[in-house]
Curated annotation (Swiss-Prot):
One biological process term in Gene Ontology: tetrahydrofolate biosynthetic process
Domain of life: Eukaryota
Role description: Catalyzes the conversion of 7,8-dihydroneopterin into 6-hydroxymethyl-7,8-dihydropterin, a biosynthetic precursor of the vitamin tetrahydrofolate. Can use L-threo-dihydroneopterin and D-erythro-dihydroneopterin as substrates for the formation of 6-hydroxymethyldihydropterin, but it can also catalyze the epimerization of carbon 2' of dihydroneopterin and dihydromonapterin.
Pathway terms, separated by semicolons: Cofactor biosynthesis; tetrahydrofolate biosynthesis; 2-amino-4-hydroxy-6-hydroxymethyl-7,8-dihydropteridine diphosphate from 7,8-dihydroneopterin triphosphate: step 3/4
Quaternary structure, from the entry: Homooctamer. Forms a hollow cylinder assembled from two ring-shaped tetramers.
Origin organism lineage: Eukaryota, Viridiplantae, Streptophyta, Embryophyta, Tracheophyta
Gene that produces this protein: FOLB3
Name of the protein described by the UniProt record: Probable dihydroneopterin aldolase 3
Protein source organism: Arabidopsis thaliana
EC number: 4.1.2.25
Tissue: Expressed at very low levels in siliques.
Keyword set, alphabetical order: Folate biosynthesis, Lyase
Gene Ontology MF, one: dihydroneopterin aldolase activity
Length: 160
């Protein structure tokens, strides 16, 4: 039987991805934080903004399209029970905060922009326990190269 990822059954591949994620979390956050990792998550995927981030003069002058994906781990129990927006983190407020940062003052490094987003999200929304931010540029123009995406992905945990 062939065991490559291309021939692996989707359910088996999904279990492998989940296991890999938990092993990653154990490495980054320590095993004790796996017990406290909330199982609820809000997802914002494919947020698109125009910004002027990067180290090249062309990036600073012409700007470019940036894509942001965000996962927010928090307890959604109260929000589910109340069906009240005040008991969760608003997608609209999250979008506005990310837009302000990405369309704001230019940064040299994508890592810095991702960290700015994660830090401000944790500061602004106390309900968030863990955040994942993926920030980058689709189809960047590199000399003699074709690349689908360049970026940085960060995980941050609230310090209680």
């Amino acid at each position: 039987m062939h065991s490559s990822l291309k021939t692996m059954a989707p359910a088996k591949l999904e279990r492998l991805c989940v296991l890999s994620f938990f092993l990653f979390c154990a490495t980054v956050f320590g095993t004790e934080s796996l017990e406290s990792l909330p199982e609820d998550k809000l997802i914002l995927r494919g947020l698109k903004f125009y910004g002027f981030h990067g180290v090249l003069p062309e990036e600073r002058e012409l700007g470019g399209l940036f894509i942001v994906d965000i996962n927010l781990w928090l307890s959604l129990k109260k929000a589910i029970e109340s069906d009240n927006l005040a008991d969760t983190v608003s997608f609209a407020d999250t979008f506005r905060l990310v837009k302000k940062i990405v369309e704001g003052p230019p940064r040299n490094l994508y890592e810095t922009v991702a960290d700015d987003i994660a830090s401000e999200m944790l500061e602004t929304f106390p309900k968030i326990n863990v955040i994942r931010v993926k920030f980058g540029k689709p189809n960047p123009s590199l000399v003699n190269s074709t690349v689908d995406f360049l970026g940085a992905e960060l995980f941050r945990k609230r310090n209680h």
